[in-house]
Amino acid sequence: MKLLTTICRLKLEKMYSKTNTSSTIFEKARHGTEKISTARSEGHHITFSRWKSCTAIGGRCKNQCDDSEFRISYCARPTTHCCVTECDPTDPNNWIPKDSVGTQEWYPKDSRH
């Protein structure tokens, strides 16, 4: 897996975590049945929509991801993938703040730090 793809994925997880007080979308997918079982015993039902989750982070549900995209998870069924476009490393909006690693500087995502 390319470094750029890995960093984009980490940025998406951080972005989602900051906008929600609960765990990341990927953790919810892994622990969904655990939460549903607990909720049912309390009389509440939790619905996890993979399609809505995919589109919430800018992904698209498709049968096959393009070369410029990477697959995060499947959508409604295992043959439909959540495809997210790779970030452009020359766009400053795609840079990650170094304060996430202890400083206040910015660096391009594809550089080694």
Curated annotation (Swiss-Prot):
Disulfide topology: 54-82, 61-75, 65-83
Keyword Transmembrane helix: no
Cellular location(s): Secreted
InterPro entries documented for this protein: Beta_defensin_dom (IPR025933)
Pfam families (UniProt xref): Defensin_beta_2
Main localization category: secreted
Cellular component annotations (GO), alphabetically ordered: extracellular region
One example of a Gene Ontology biological process annotation: defense response to bacterium
Keywords: Antibiotic, Antimicrobial, Defensin, Disulfide bond, Secreted, Signal
Family: Belongs to the beta-defensin family.
Function: Has antibacterial activity.
Protein name: Beta-defensin 112
Organism in which the protein naturally occurs: Homo sapiens
Gene name linked to the record: DEFB112
